[in-house]
Each structure stands twice: as structure tokens, then as C-alpha cells.
């Protein structure tokens, strides 16, 4: 009998599962000292082990015995220990504003250099500090403090070596040291490390804590000489934590389920960029504007959430969280199952090769081959067949967003196309939809002409190839020009009022947070790495605001009519001709008249009192300024 009792007790002990400990206060942005209690949530006999430097607790970590007192930024991580069993790690980030303001360039245990340069000789100097010229200025210090509180905090926590180890090892090397760029030495590409992610605060009062994998993301932004502030990708897999993140990240309109998220650093037109002219144009809203505008037009679009990123408690700057375009994105936005989704993109592996990151290239190749056969007749069979392979309305609007923006870093890369290829309960199979992505190099020269869908090296890109094939068809050409007239009119979605409304909504989301970004990275090209040309101390008042004024006074008021003229010249069809059928339909419905002196807007509606914009009068285009 005693033998059986011993076996039973042994089984009970060895099968006990340690539970995550609980903190008396969760993650938060803090102004003053805090006392934190850690409590056992499982077996009362458990021991709590904890660390305060971001490292993973082990059996040899400190034993918790009494409340912890914090007066500076602390990453608290704790486990419950029962025998040989350790619970999953609980993590809470306590970010002190005073610690951010005094963030130095020599944090204990962190390296003084980062990765090797790729296209020039040398090694990147590490840069951790907040610029003391800004934080030491009482006026700017107050604005930085206010800016830190404007957005949610995204705290990314992992063992220090997972980010910054110089050991060239696939399992132990630091992902911020071995960045895996698309040119040169690819060491580090795809390396993924376990991490804890917390999202908290901000206007939405976010409250998320989850374990996941973290890896670097991007193309040339991985090159240390070009960009010291890298983008990341969060990967949700069972080996790191939950298989899928279920959280309303982007609000009620969001699907709320993700297996990957991208933390976009704002590489193009940003203060840390390697190119001096690029830095002058920093606005931190161009790419998000394109995505928001695509959604405003009623199309599938990639959402965004601005955040302040912290790495192991150190402020890393202004980022935006974006959905990763993959099979989960496709399923949630287009319907069907994950296996029904094709995602096509350009992989920046040095050769900018086309790939199906999900699904196959079969439908894409069929679409491109069919487009190559398109003829001019309205009844052209190839053009009719494209309706099942391409969402033409989406494609036209996608082209017009990029043409309006004057995108000069596009076509040969920086785009996604996604489709559902099976008939499901959500409907029949769909044509490819193009998504705005990495649209950072826009709103530069108000006169730049990308009406052809291409600039310089982009002229042979897949997007422009498809566009040129479609323009051979008269029906598509008129449809495209007519839509251009509608969107680019004064009251259109790409008219000044609509464009500025989206632009200003983004500005007012980050206007205070920009002061924190400036303090973190505004001095980099002056004080740390002066590649090609010595930079300035980039500040909101001296650099950001002048560029904002330029856009509001010299770009947005004129760009719509300029692009419309460029499109008419390139296609060889006037807006008046493109809108002729639309106006004829209006007259047939008895909604208008062709009487002399009557103006038609580009949606075909008549008016006797036109405001600024483009109109049709007596069959001719009229610009009212």
C-alpha cells in the first residue's frame, strides 16, 4: 500500500505545471517611483525567480521575497519554479520618462559597435542615446515628454545577445549585428529570436502582452551604413507562444487575427537616412497616407498603427505597426482559406526577383500572358478574360495613387498583389488586387511625371508592363482616364481637400511624438555617421515644419491638375473624351443639360457655380483656379 501511495505522490509532483506569476501593476509609462508586488498564481509552494535587465529568468536568477522598488526604467521578467519545472515567462515593462530623457550612449553590457558596413568599409558605431542638446533644452524637454505620451508604447524584450551578440552563429548571433541585407553578406537573413512584446497606453489605451519571435525586416534598410534604425517582423508560432495573435490591433474595423506583423521604422524620407536631400523631406506619413487613401477609396489596404518602440527598455523611436501581407491577411480580407490565397511580390535579393510568397505564380503568369494579348477593340477577348484575373477597378485606383504621389521608388519593387483563387462561400475566385506598400518616396517634386507608370529604372517593372498592355485597349484607356478625372477633380478623393484631410489626420496623430523621434535620431548623421555628407541636427521646428508648409502650399494645391494633364498627354485621350459617355448617360437620365454655360464635374454632374477644380464645358476641359 505504501508503495502505491509513493507512486501516486511522485506522479502528482512530477506532473505539476508551474503557472505564470502575476504583477500588481502591469506595464506602463511612469513619471515617478513605483512599488511592484509579484504573486504566485499556481501552486503555493512555488518559488518566484526574476530578472530586471530583460534576460530570461532561470533557476539561478534572483528569488523574489518582497515588493520591488523601481525608480528608473525596468524590464521585470519572472517565472514560477516548482521542482525542475519553470513556468512561461511573465514580462512587464516599466518605462520611466526620466530614464528616456537621460538615455545614454553606453548602457551597461551593450556593445559600442553594431554590424559591418556592406557597400563601404567599416563598422557601424552603436547609437543608443537621446541627443543631450535636445533633452537639455527645457522647452524641447517638455515637448519630448509630451510626445512620449501621445502614442502607445510597444516594448520589445529579449535576451540582450539575441539583439546584439557579435558571435557569428545562426542560433546565438545578434539580429541587429547580422542584419542579412539583400546585397553583400546575407548572414543573419531570416534569423528569428524569442521575444516578449507588450503594447500599452496611447489614446486607445492598449493592453497587450504576448510571446513571439522577432526578426529583422526590409531590403536596403538593413544596410548599416544606410540606416541604423531597422525594421522588425513579429512572428507568431507555437514554438514562441500563441500560433496566432488575436487582438483588435487596428480597432473595430480590423480582423484582429495575425500570424505576422511588421514594425516599420520609416526608412525613406527620414532623419536617419543616408541621403541628405532625403532627410530634408522627413514627414513620417507618406507610406501610411498611401495605404489610408487606398482604404478610403474602398479597396483592400494594409492598416497601420503608430507607436513608440522600446528595445529592452531603451527608446528606439517612432515606428508604425503594419499587417504582414501573407496567406492569413488574404484569408481575413478576401475570404476563403489560407490555401486559397496567392501573394505576389518582388523579393529584394539583389536581383529583385518575382516570387509567390504564398500560393503559386500560375494565375499571375496567366494574367500577364493574357494582358500581353490585349487588343484595341472594345470586344477584345483577352481584355474580357482579364476580368477574372485582375480587379481592374482596384488596379486603376492603385496606379492613380502612385501617379499622384509621384512615386519614384516603385514598380521594380515595393508592391504586393493578392488574390483568392478558389470559389468559396465568400464568392467566386477573384482577380489580383494590388496593395500600396512601402510608398515612402512620394510628394517630392510637384512636377514629377510618372503617368507612364514608371520612372528611370522602373520602366520595365511588372506593374508598368501590365499597365501598358491594358492601355492598348480603348475601353480600358477611357475607363482609366475617366476615373482619373473623377479622383483628381477638386471634390475627388485625390483632390486637394481629400488629400489634405488624410494627411492632416496623420500629422495630428504624431505631431507631438515627432519631438521624441528627433531627439533619438535627429543627430545621427551629424554626430555618429556622416556618410556622403555631414547632416544637421534635425528638429521638428527647423526641418519638419518647413517641409510640411511646402507640401500644403506648393504641392497639394497644384498636384491634381498637373497629374491630370500628364495622364491626358501620355494616354492621348482627354478627360472630356473620357467623360463623354458619362455625361451622355447623365443627359439621358434627365439630370443635366448641355446648355451653353453649364459646367459638368468629372462625375458627370452639372453645376452653374463651379469652385476650383477641373470641369467639362461644351465638351472641353476647363480648369477653374
Residue ranges and their predicted role:
Residues 2-10:
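Sec-dependent signal peptide recognition
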Residues 9-18:
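Hydrophobic h-region of N-terminal signal peptides that target proteins for export
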Residues 18-186, 192-194, 199-202, 207-213, ...:
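Short, compositionally stereotyped local motifs that mark structural "simplifiers"
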Residues 72, 611-615:
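A glycine-anchored, Pro-Gly-centered beta-turn/N-cap motif
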Residues 103-157, 161-176, 185-187, 196, ...:
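Middle-to-C-terminal accessory/interaction subdomains
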Residues 172-354:
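Conserved ATP-binding subdomain of kinase catalytic cores across diverse folds
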Residues 568-603:
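Residue-level detector of functionally pivotal "anchor" positions at catalytic/ligand-binding pockets or at interdomain
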Residues 614-625:
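C-terminal tail/sorting-segment detector
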Amino acid at each position: 500500500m505504501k508503495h502505491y501511495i509513493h507512486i501516486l505522490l511522485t506522479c502528482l509532483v512530477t506532473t505539476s505545471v508551474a503557472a505564470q506569476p502575476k504583477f500588481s501593476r502591469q506595464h506602463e509609462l511612469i513619471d515617478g517611483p513605483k512599488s511592484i508586488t509579484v504573486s504566485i498564481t499556481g501552486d503555493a509552494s512555488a518559488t518566484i525567480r526574476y530578472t530586471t535587465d530583460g534576460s530570461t529568468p532561470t533557476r539561478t536568477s534572483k528569488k523574489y521575497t518582497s515588493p520591488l522598488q523601481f525608480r528608473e526604467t525596468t524590464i521585470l521578467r519572472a517565472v514560477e519554479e516548482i521542482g525542475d519545472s519553470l513556468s512561461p515567462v511573465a514580462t512587464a515593462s516599466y518605462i520611466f520618462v526620466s530614464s528616456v530623457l537621460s538615455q545614454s550612449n553606453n548602457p551597461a553590457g551593450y556593445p559600442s559597435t553594431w554590424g559591418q558596413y556592406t557597400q563601404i568599409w567599416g563598422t557601424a558605431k552603436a547609437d543608443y542615446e537621446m541627443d543631450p542638446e535636445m533633452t537639455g533644452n527645457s522647452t524641447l524637454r517638455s515637448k519630448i515628454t509630451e510626445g512620449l505620451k501621445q502614442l502607445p508604447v510597444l516594448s520589445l524584450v529579449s535576451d540582450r545577445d539575441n539583439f546584439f551578440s557579435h558571435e557569428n552563429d545562426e542560433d546565438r548571433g545578434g539580429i541587429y549585428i547580422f542584419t542579412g541585407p539583400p546585397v553583400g553578406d546575407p548572414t543573419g537573413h531570416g534569423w528569428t529570436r524569442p521575444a516578449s512584446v507588450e503594447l500599452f497606453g496611447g489614446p486607445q489605451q492598449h493592453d497587450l502582452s504576448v510571446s513571439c519571435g522577432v526578426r529583422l525586416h526590409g531590403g536596403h534598410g538593413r544596410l548599416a551604413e544606410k540606416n541604423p534604425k531597422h525594421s522588425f517582423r513579429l512572428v507568431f508560432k507555437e514554438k514562441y507562444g500563441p500560433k496566432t495573435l488575436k487582438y483588435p490591433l487596428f480597432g473595430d474595423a480590423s480582423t484582429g487575427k495575425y500570424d505576422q506583423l511588421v514594425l516599420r521604422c520609416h526608412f525613406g524620407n527620414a532623419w536617419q537616412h543616408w541621403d541628405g536631400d532625403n532627410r530634408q523631406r522627413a514627414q513620417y506619413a507618406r507610406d501610411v497616407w498611401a495605404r489610408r487613401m487606398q482604404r478610403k477609396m474602398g479597396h483592400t489596404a494594409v492598416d497601420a498603427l503608430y507607436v513608440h518602440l522600446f528595445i529592452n527598455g531603451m527608446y528606439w523611436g517612432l515606428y508604425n505597426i503594419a499587417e504582414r501581407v501573407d496567406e492569413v491577411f488574404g484569408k481575413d480580407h478576401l475570404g476563403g482559406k489560407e490555401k486559397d490565397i496567392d501573394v505576389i511580390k518582388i523579393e529584394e535579393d539583389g536581383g529583385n526577383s518575382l516570387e509567390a510568397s504564398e500560393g503559386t505564380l500560375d494565375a499571375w503568369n496567366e494574367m500577364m500572358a493574357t494582358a500581353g494579348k490585349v487588343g484595341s477593340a472594345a470586344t477584345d477577348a483577352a481584355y474580357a478574360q482579364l476580368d477574372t484575373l485582375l480587379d481592374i477597378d482596384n488596379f486603376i485606383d492603385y496606379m492613380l495613387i502612385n501617379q499622384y504621389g509621384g512615386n519614384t521608388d516603385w514598380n521594380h519593387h515595393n508592391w504586393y498583389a493578392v488574390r483568392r483563387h478558389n470559389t468559396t462561400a465568400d464568392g467566386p475566385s477573384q482577380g489580383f488586387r494590388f496593395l500600396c506598400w512601402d510608398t515612402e518616396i512620394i510628394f517630392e517634386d510637384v512636377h514629377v511625371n510618372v503617368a507612364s507608370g514608371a520612372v528611370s529604372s522602373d520602366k520595365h517593372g511588372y506593374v508598368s508592363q501590365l499597365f501598358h498592355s491594358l492601355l492598348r485597349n480603348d475601353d480600358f484607356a477611357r475607363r482609366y482616364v475617366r476615373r482619373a478625372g473623377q479622383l483628381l477633380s477638386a471634390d475627388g478623393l485625390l483632390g486637394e481637400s481629400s488629400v489634405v484631410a488624410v494627411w492632416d489626420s496623420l500629422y495630428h496623430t504624431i505631431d507631438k511624438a515627432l519631438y521624441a523621434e528627433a531627439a533619438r535620431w535627429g543627430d545621427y548623421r551629424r554626430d555618429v555617421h556622416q556618410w556622403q555628407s555631414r547632416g544637421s541636427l534635425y528638429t521638428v521646428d527647423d526641418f519638419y515644419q518647413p517641409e510640411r508648409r511646402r507640401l500644403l502650399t506648393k504641392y497639394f494645391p497644384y498636384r491634381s491638375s498637373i497629374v491630370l494633364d500628364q495622364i491626358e498627354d501620355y494616354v492621348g485621350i482627354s478627360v472630356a473624351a473620357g467623360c463623354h459617355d458619362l455625361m451622355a448617360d447623365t443627359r439621358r437620365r434627365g439630370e443635366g443639360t448641355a446648355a451653353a454655360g453649364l459646367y459638368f464635374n468629372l462625375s458627370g454632374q452639372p453645376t452653374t457655380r463651379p469652385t476650383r477644380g477641373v470641369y467639362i464645358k461644351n465638351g472641353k476641359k476647363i480648369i477653374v483656379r
